[in-house]
């Protein structure tokens, strides 16, 4: 093992993770924030979420973060964050019986759980009963509503920074910095340093 967590992180179904948050996404976001020095971070999980053991191995890290992505930091506005959050919130829909479910656009023609993003450093209030594109109600950064004219640095993987997955809002954002180390290697280094 390269390190040990306080507790193992069990795999859960994608809808539960999207509703309640993910300890694994929290860990990856913490790694990205430390590696980049950015204000906020986002990450996504693969379509197949696996258990993450308490005794962490390189194999477990690579299984949990299977993408060969590198880390980029970009400068974003509230408008960009709102567009990105709206895209992520479009993951949610309602079944005919009124229960929360995953939108068909993330399930067909291919499964795209990896296009739901988990943010760190923001407190977001959303109303899922509103139409897609009008769900974000509040974006709070450091205890205050984020003003329209304030910019933040956001660390994310190079795939998402390219606008992939329906996140074209990031394509025109200025690049602040880039790390060419794969994110799975950054996670390994982080666990080694903080075990």
Show where each model-derived region lies.
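Feature captures C-terminal
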Residues: 26-195
